[in-house]
Structures are given as structure tokens and as C-alpha cells.
From Swiss-Prot:
This is Small ribosomal subunit protein uS15. One of its GO terms (molecular function) is structural constituent of ribosome. It comes from Mycobacterium tuberculosis (strain ATCC 25618 / H37Rv). It holds the Pfam family Ribosomal_S15. GO terms for biological process: translation.
Amino acid sequence: MALTAEQKKEILRSYGLHETDTGSPEAQIALLTKRIADLTEHLKVHKHDHHSRRGLLLLVGRRRRLIKYISQIDVERYRSLIERLGLRR
């Protein structure tokens, strides 16, 4: 299921650099993480939904590239974000 406007606002408020921040890597990674979690739950129920599985793999790849970018520009921001989101690294 797609994220509602309220869910997006809450995520952006928590992870963005300021109130209306939508473009920072932290905000983008947080939104992707929520979408990935939702798709993962969907695929647990609908195991043969291969179109959604492909979409999930694309989202994971996009998040991986953003995480790599933020780790190269500022290691402290990277470590903080990984800890806050509870991602493995």
C-alpha cells in the first residue's frame, strides 16, 4: 500500500533536516525504508506477486545507492541514520 500524506509528513518531520525537507538523503532513505517494509509485508502474504518483488528490488537498490552516497560525504550522519532506522551495516 502506498504511503499516505500524513505518514510521509511524519517521516519527513522525524528524519528531514528541517520541516519541509524532502530532498536530503536522510529523508529519502527514511521514506524508502518505510516503503520497503510495507512491500516486504505484502510479499509475505502474496508470495507469487513477482511484479511487486521487482519493485522491491528496485527500491532496495535505490536505498543502497543513497546510503553509499551519505556514507561517502559524512560518516557521522551515516552512522546516526543507520542507528535511527535500525538497518544492518
